[in-house]
Amino acid sequence: MFRQEMARYPKKSIKKRRVGRRKYGSKAATSHDYSSSGSILVPENTVKVFRIEPTDKTLPRYFIWKMFMLLVCKVKPGRILHWAMIKSSWEINQPTTCLEAPGLFIKPEHSHLVKLVCSGELEAGVATGTSDVECLLRKTTVLRKNVTEVDYLYLAFYCSSGVSINYQNRITYHV
C-alpha cells in the first residue's frame, strides 16, 4: 500500500518545482525598465546607491559576492572605485555620505540601523578584462560576518572618475 502511494508523486514533478525556485530576483523587479537598460555611467565624485531586494530567506556570502560581480561591469583604467554593500531596513531618500579608506560608508539621516556587509576600493590597471577586475576586487574586499538576515541590501559606489555598472533584474531601483 505504501509503494502505491509513492507512485502517485513522480520525480519529474518535483524537479520542475525546484527549477522555478532558482530565480533569485524578485518578480516585481523583472517588470522594471532598469532590467533592460543595460549599463549606466556613474558620474565623477558622486555616490550611486542601488537597492537589492533578496527573495531568499538566507543570503549566504557566496551569493552576495556573485550578485556584486554581476553589478560591476567595467572600471576605467587608472580609476579608483570605492564601494560598499550595506544592509538595512530603511528607505534611502537623501543619505548622508562620508568616505572612509578603504571603501565607502553610508549613514542615513534618520536612522542608525545600518550594517556594513562588505567594503573595499579598487584601482583599475591597464588590463580591462573582467577576470582581472574580479581578482582585484577579491584582494581588496573586506567581508563582514553573519550576513544571513532577511533584509534589503544597498550597494553604493564612489569612483574618482566614473565607472560603468551593469545591473540586472536583481535591482529594484536606484537612487
From Swiss-Prot:
Pfam families: Nanovirus_coat
UniProt cross-references to InterPro entries, sorted A to Z: Nanovirus_coat
Keyword Protein transport: no
Cell wall biogenesis/degradation listed as a keyword: no
Region (Disordered): 1-35
GO-annotated cellular components: T=1 icosahedral viral capsid
Coiled coil: none
Localization per Swiss-Prot or TrEMBL: Virion
UniProt similarity note: Belongs to the nanoviridae capsid protein family.
Protein name listed in UniProt: Capsid protein
